[in-house]
């Protein structure tokens, strides 16, 4: 299925995070991703949505999170935007630094980058937008498939 776009404007709640995560899983399934990739995409969306609700909007009921999913045929493109004060990507601490290894938070962007092919940040007025891209790969692109 290509050309399919789904967009939501959601409240700054954990229920909204769940909605975004579930939609990501469904869209990844329809785009033809294998179960392990669907799980990674869903986790990346969950992390980005939690960041938008918790860090961006600070659970402010007046602020919204906008989420869009688009299957381009070549990729699943997911955009999540908040209405917070903005994020400077350079200010995000390295989760692999010895000072940060035992902290209970701070790994979300690291995980998002690990699970997605491309991650882009854009400053909004107000807020931050993150775009997550996962490319669709044919069977020949999977090195484990070539040896079966």
Can you annotate each of these PLM segments?
Residues 1-7, 52-148:
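Conserved beta-strand-loop-beta-strand hairpin that lines the nucleotide-binding pocket
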Residues 7-19:
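STAS-typified acidic loop motif
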Residues 12, 43, 123:
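Conserved strand-loop elements at the edges of beta-sheets that form or border functional pockets
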Residues 15, 36-39, 63:
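Conserved catalytic/ATP-binding subdomain
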Residues 19, 40-43, 75, 114:
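Alpha-helical macromolecular-interaction surfaces
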Residues 22-46, 101-104:
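Conserved short strand/loop->alpha-helix "switch" segment adjacent to the catalytic nucleotide/phosphoryl-transfer site
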Residues 47, 51:
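Conserved polar catalytic motif of the HATPase_c/GHKL fold
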């Amino acid at each position: 299925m290509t050309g399919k776009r789904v967009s939501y404007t959601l409240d700054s709640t954990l229920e909204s995070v769940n909605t975004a995560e579930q939609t990501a899983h469904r869209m990844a399934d329809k785009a033809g991703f294998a179960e392990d990739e669907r799980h990674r995409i869903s986790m990346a969306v969950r992390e980005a949505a939690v960041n938008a609700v918790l860090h961006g909007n600070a659970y402010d009921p007046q602020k919204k999170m906008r989420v869009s999913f688009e299957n381009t045929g070549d990729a699943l493109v997911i955009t999540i935007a908040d209405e917070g004060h903005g994020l400077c990507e350079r200010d995000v601490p390295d989760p692999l630094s010895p000072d940060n290894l035992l902290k209970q938070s701070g790994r979300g962007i690291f995980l998002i980058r690990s699970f997605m092919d491309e991650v882009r940040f854009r400053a909004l007025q107000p807020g931050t937008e993150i775009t997550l891209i996962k490319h669709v790969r044919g069977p020949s692109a999977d090195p484990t498939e070539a040896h079966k």
